[in-house]
Every structure is written in C-alpha cells, then in structure tokens.
Amino acid sequence: GSIYVLNNPYYPVGDQISATAFAAYCRDGNFIMLCSGGYVGMYQQQKGLGILYEMLFALFGNFNYTPAKILHVIWWVLAILAGYGFLKLNTDRAIFRIVYCIMMLGCIPFLLYLPYIYGDVLSISFGMVMFWAVSAYEHYEKKRYIALAACVAGIAVLARKNTWIILFGVGIF
C-alpha cells in the first residue's frame, strides 16, 4: 500500500483541493473561506477535514501530501486489524475471521481509487477502532477502552459527520 501511494502521482482535485487550501489559508491567517460565500462557509462539514490538514501542514509544510498518503495506508491497516480484533473478541469461530479477511480484500479498489485522505478512510478506520474498543471494554471491563472509544469517535466525527450513524449503532450495541 505504501509503495503504491508514494509512487502514485495523484494530487487532490475539486473538493479535496479546496479543503487543503482552506487549511493552508488558515495557517497563513487568511480566513476568507469561512465567510458565507467561501468554500467552508457553504460546506460546513469540511471544517474537520480542514483541521486535520492544518495539523499535517503544520508538521510537514503546506500542500505536502506525502504524509497524508502514508497515513491513509496506516489507517487502512488499522481498520482491518480493528475489525479482526472485534471479531476475535465476539466469536470463537475462526470462519468468521477468515471470511472477514477475504471480504476486506474487496476494499483494495477503494485504496486504489482514493490514495489520498479525504476523511472517508479516517472515519471508517476510527469507527472500526471504536467498535473494537467498546467490545474490549465489555470483555475486559477496563475504562481505558471507553476512553479510547470516545477519543476515536470524536476524531471520526470530526473527519466525517456521517459517522454519527456509527455512534448511534454503538449506543444501541
């Protein structure tokens, strides 16, 4: 995965470039995109992604997409491991974990299609970690798992507002 994203000449376009431009502008003290006619003023859900990129740009420089691409791969691996861990805690039958791993191979086109962070992979990954953490809390009864679930839930919602759906699922679970 890392070799693919590092060798892929993909650069953000459309909404992606607007979200990263918002982060770079904010780092320079220009908040024009927050106005009612600005990009983030019209698309409020992009604030979280802009904050994520603002942190990445603060560490690695404006419009440096390489760290974002590497994080994309790390979050995919984290999502796969969290899902596997969730199944390991909730079932003793290995067939479910085997089927899960085979089904996760179906996500490879998503990785190839999106070698760049746009919030989807982050929210999926941290949503999976949240399910694992809640399940681990039920299994081990250690408060650190609930703290982890709360932290990753907050980050997941920050990246993508539709992650609220997962939070309702956890509440029902």
Residue ranges and their predicted role:
Residues Q44-Q45, L49, Y53-G61, A68-G83, ...:
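Transmembrane alpha-helices of multi-pass, membrane-embedded glycan-processing enzymes
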Residues N8-F22, D28-L52, L59-T66:
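Extracytoplasmic catalytic/substrate-binding loops of multi-pass membrane glycan-assembly enzymes
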Residues H139, I166-F173:
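Perimembrane helix-loop-helix junctions
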Residues K88-T91, M130-Y145:
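Membrane-interface transmembrane helices that cradle and orient dolichyl/undecaprenyl
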Residues Y145-R160, V170-I172:
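Membrane-interface alpha helices of multi-pass inner-membrane proteins
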